[in-house]
């Protein structure tokens, strides 16, 4: 079925990232799996948020409908198909940072990353569906979607 293929495609992509030496693994505290990250900028501040802290972040989240295809491609119908979907981004809100409580307002994978980041860090993180929106999905995000975020941790809000 389409869903099975979609699930397999997403799991295969995450496995590919997991096997890549460019990325580092972090186990989720929930025990439901791991995320992968690549450091883009090293904040080097030594300040890491706790589960209960509120943080200020800039981020962009995206996924692909078909991981084997380019970000955009010409479909069988001859039309341009937008394959890479940005589903949420502070860039679309005038780069106003978002504030979240690390442990209670975020999907598991995002929360896991934040607890290992230092203020000033900018990471690319890959989240498997188990630590994202699960089998049911949310809004534009279908169930079993592997998610990618670029996150910049600006501050721990006191």
Short names for language-model regions:
Residues 1-158:
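Cross-family detector of peptidyl-prolyl cis-trans isomerase
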């Amino acid at each position: 079925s389409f869903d099975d293929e979609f699930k397999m495609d997403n799991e295969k992509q995450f496995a590919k990232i997991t096997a890549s030496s460019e990325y580092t693994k972090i186990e989720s505290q929930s025990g439901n799996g791991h995320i992968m990250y690549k450091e883009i900028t090293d904040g080097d501040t030594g300040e890491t948020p706790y589960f209960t802290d509120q943080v200020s972040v800039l981020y962009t989240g995206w996924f692909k409908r078909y991981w084997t295809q380019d970000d955009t491609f010409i479909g069988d119908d001859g039309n341009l198909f937008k394959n890479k979907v940005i589903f949420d981004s502070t860039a679309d809100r005038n780069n106003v940072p978002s504030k979240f409580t690390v442990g209670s307002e975020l999907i598991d994978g995002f929360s896991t990353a934040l607890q290992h980041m230092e203020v000033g860090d900018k990471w690319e993180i890959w989240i498997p569906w188990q630590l994202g929106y699960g089998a049911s999905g949310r809004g534009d995000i279908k169930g079993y979607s592997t998610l990618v975020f670029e996150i910049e941790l600006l501050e721990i809000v006191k």
